[in-house]
UniProtKB/Swiss-Prot annotation:
Localization in the cell: Mitochondrion
Organism: Arabidopsis thaliana (Mouse-ear cress)
Family assignment from sequence similarity: Belongs to the PPR family. P subfamily.
PROSITE patterns the UniProt entry points to: PPR
Swiss-Prot/TrEMBL GO biological process terms: RNA splicing
Annotated GO CC locations: mitochondrion
Span of chain positions assigned to the transit peptide in the UniProt entry: 1-37
Keyword vocabulary terms for this entry: Mitochondrion, Repeat, Transit peptide
Record-linked Pfam families: PPR (PF01535)
Stated name of the protein: Pentatricopeptide repeat-containing protein At3g02490, mitochondrial
Amino acid sequence: MRYQWRSLLFRSYRSSPRPFLSHHSRFQVISNSTRSFSSFLHERFGVQQRQCLFALRSPLASSVSRRFSSESAIEEKLPAETVVIDVFSRLNGKDEITKELDSNDVVISHELALRVLRELESSPDVAGRFFKWGLEAYPQKLSSKSYNTMLRIFGVNGLVDEFWRLVDDMKKKGHGVSANVRDRVGDKFKKDGLENDLERLKELFASGSMDNSVDKVCNRVCKIVMKEVWGADVEKQLRDLKLEFKSDVVKMVLEKLDVDPRKALLFFRWIDESGSFKHDEKTYNAMARVLGKEKFLDRFQHMIEEIRSAGYEMEMETYVRVSARFCQTKMIKEAVELFEFAMAGSISNTPTPHCCSLLLKKIVTAKKLDMDLFTRTLKAYTGNGNVVPDVMLQHVLKSLRSVDRFGQSNEVLKAMNEGGYVPSGDLQSVIASGLSRKGKKDEANELVNFMEASGNHLDDKAMASLVEGHCDAKDLEEASECFKKMIGKEGVSYAGYAFEKLVLAYCNSFQARDVYKLFSELVKQNQLKPWHSTYKIMVRNLLMKKVARDGGFEEALSLLPMMRNHGFPPFVDPFMDYLSNSGTSAEAFAFLKAVTSKKFPSNSMVLRVFEAMLKSARHSEAQDLLSMSPSYIRRNAEVLELFNTMKPEKCSLEKPLPAPAQIEA
């Protein structure tokens, strides 16, 4: 029977239980995200940055601050139309233009071409240069709307000759002049007194030539197809139109029939078998986009295989839109198969790194993290020789954190490592910090072991982030062990930051004396050189009143020689506060002995101690200290004058400085 496909298409559709693409198919499936439908189409990251939907703008800033626990910030890219306008405003050479666009990951699409032209309405030279370049480089991307937009630019800017030349070109290509262009340009002609051109424009419409514009033809065809059940009568009405079907018309008809994919497919088959039109890459892809829905999954599969069999490629616009639909409807497995298929196409037409990143984000945020799908996506991407960039892992990590699955970051890292990826030091820090801060002790240790096994040790920044994370999680014991492992592997050269975080965490947990033991051990046995600020934190906390009474004062004193040996000036302010408030004369004398490498400190230091005690009305303790001092101090004129001028009846009690509480870095 003629057109046997008709009866098949009218059968009730039943979902096929078989996979999207059988494993016998030599075609794999690719995934380029689609706009929802329009926004996703223009968000391409790599070679087609603005064509991926679900774009979470975002690429993480890869630097980690001195805290090493910072989250990557997402770097926002300029809109593609802004980049294109800038390029064509500056450059003229084709090679220069192409190179510049490629370096900015810009790919021309129908929508992008329209946006660029609309932005350039007041710049006809730049618009004309872009349009001419587009005709040569991407003729299939310039639709009837693009032609009309360029026509309007010529008309409203008074470029009459260029306007009529383009009208003639449009007639040859089957494009009509829109009513909007007629009205806008007609007003311009009238204003400029161009009566002949105005009359010519009116005649163009009066002749009825516009009845064959793409939009008009499309509307007539769609009205016939949608009005009745498909049959011989519908086919007769279509033949009676006596239309010469062109690619743009067929594509537009299929897009408008998107609401009824069955009728779109009937029209698609009929127009080919009736000899009215031979399908090209543009119309094949338009049909595939219409069928790319859950209900028509089998037919979509057959269509994209048919595209390849006919010697054409699945356009990125097709991949992007269909992939977006799959992801929106939670068809993640089908989206991965589509990605595999697309990656098996020509190298110049495969999904970009950004599209791969978007799909990976959808996988890790799905109801259940399917690592098999994650691995398949990476294999499809790296199979073409692509290299996984840091930004891809950054996006995935952010997505894991958003669904509280950061603990599974090791699984993700292992899968990416199989493709040859090694995370940068900054990303190692992000993972290490994230795991330890969440209290994922086992996972944090697993990260260290995995990196070692793969021959890539965590660097000093990442180890510091691990220590800091354990500190933030209040797991001081694990933080201490981690720090010891760190200096055991990396040495003490870059341990200052991590050690200060460790000291601070102990002090804020009121365990200054515990961390003092670790402090002394590491300085004496491991030649650790703490920062000056770390010494200050230790001294302040050991001299807190209760801690000082229980032995903290003596421990704080012992830090003064260490400080001196490391080339730092002694930190004496907390000692002055302590001695003026509650310190004994014996403690004051011990301080004076410890603050210098000589037998006794300078007169100025001694005077400072006496003054602090006398100002706080601690005359008895000051007298005791004086009696313990060397004779040259007891006979010193300045010392005697100080005691004379600050006798009890002349000295007013000054409010002592408050004892330091928790110290922050």
